Amino acid sequence: MSAVNQANYAALIRRYFAACNAGDHAALLSCFTPDAVHYFPAGLPDIPWRTAETIAAKWVWCVENLGSQWTIEKILVSHDSHEAVIEWTHWKGKLGTALRGDEWYVFDEQSGLIKEIRAYYASPADKEVAINELVDFDYTGRGYNLEPANAHTKSGAAK
């Protein structure tokens, strides 16, 4: 694994948010690998957003149609993996609303660009599904737990 440059990754996230706020399509593209994916919880149309082009176009649309602006509340960059997590607020000026959430970033080791974002935010649980999770994210392939740790014990209590 190549060395992790925490300052560069934090600066890239800030540059990404500045490009979002400016609705700058070219600047947004420059933050991502061409095949980047942005995952979201259920409720938005056409998710996940696949490719840098799609991600850039969707954020420009939000700025133009919703009056979107974002603030970064916190950034935490890993010291031993090419990942980061942030807290943000998405201000929807034309709607007079805001949404708070977190995002998990995965960076491409060679280019240093964003290759994946997983968004988690304050939204109501969907009572129609057994597990509320990101749409089309490969939880199984990534090794996530698919049931509680104590699911196989007789009483349900941890051993």
What is each model feature region?
Residues S2-C31, D35:
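Short acidic-aromatic low-complexity motifs
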Residues A3, N8, V60-K159:
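A beta-strand edge to alpha-helix "cap/lid" segment located at domain peripheries
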Residues N8-Y9, A36, A52, L95:
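Hydrophobic alpha-helical segments, principally membrane-spanning helices and signal/leader peptides
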Residues A10-A19, A42-G43, K58-C62, P148-A151:
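Short, mixed-charge, low-aromatic patches
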Residues Y16, L28-L29, A36, T51, ...:
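Hydrophobic pocket/interface hotspot
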Residues Y16-A19, Y39, Q69, W91:
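Alpha-helix C-capping/helix-to-loop hinge sites
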Residues A19-A22, A36, P41, A84, ...:
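Small-side-chain structural scaffolding
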Residues H25-S81:
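A solvent-exposed, acidic/Ser-Thr-rich amphipathic alpha-helical stretch
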